[in-house]
Amino acid sequence: MFISFEGTEGVGKTTLIRKIHQHFEEQGKQVVLTREPGGTPLAEQIRSMLLAVNHDENMSHDTELLLIYAARAQHLQQVILPALESNKIVLSDRFTDASFAYQCSGRGLSQDKLQLLNQNFVSRMPEVTFWLDAPIELGMNRARERGALDRFEQEKLSFFTKVREGYETLWKVEPERIKRLDATQSPDQVFEQALQYLA
């Protein structure tokens, strides 16, 4: 089983992933915990490039998208697909839905570009995607409490409003796969919401 976790900054994805990871391990299941961009040494190097705040050169939106898919291709081939073939459960902090929300809805890139990349480089989609939804201001306040903000976290509220709208669009198009969780609730309550879809 392949499960991805989506949402804007500071909505509690990491906490939920840890709880679900523990839940499956207590059932004696083998679980692979991973993230995007990242998940392999090479993909983590790309992640560092994507998140770094560079005051000397602005990264173009196309470059950002291509770097994310370079990391994703490596991640799929090296981690996700081998784990699924070994009947392990894969829990991924973000996957392709993040690219639609952040790069298409947030940055304004063409969906055709994303579709082309998905057709050529994404051979497997998650069976379940949890979208943790909370007001943008709440998530950003949580993100600021964690410390220094990365390149994405430094974006304006208007950007994250578009990102959230992107997630909402996907949820309405694919309600069978994408499950919206109310991330304004406590971590335990969010976990209980998620378990209902995994029963």
UniProtKB/Swiss-Prot annotation:
Protein keywords: ATP-binding, Kinase, Nucleotide biosynthesis, Nucleotide-binding, Transferase
Keyword S-adenosyl-L-methionine: no
Positions of disulphide bridges: none
EC number(s) per entry: 2.7.4.9
One of the record's GO molecular function terms: ATP binding
Catalytic activity line of the entry: dTMP + ATP = dTDP + ADP
InterPro entries: P-loop_NTPase, Thymidylate_kin-like_dom, Thymidylate_kinase
Cited function: Phosphorylation of dTMP to form dTDP in both de novo and salvage pathways of dTTP synthesis.
Protein name as annotated: Thymidylate kinase
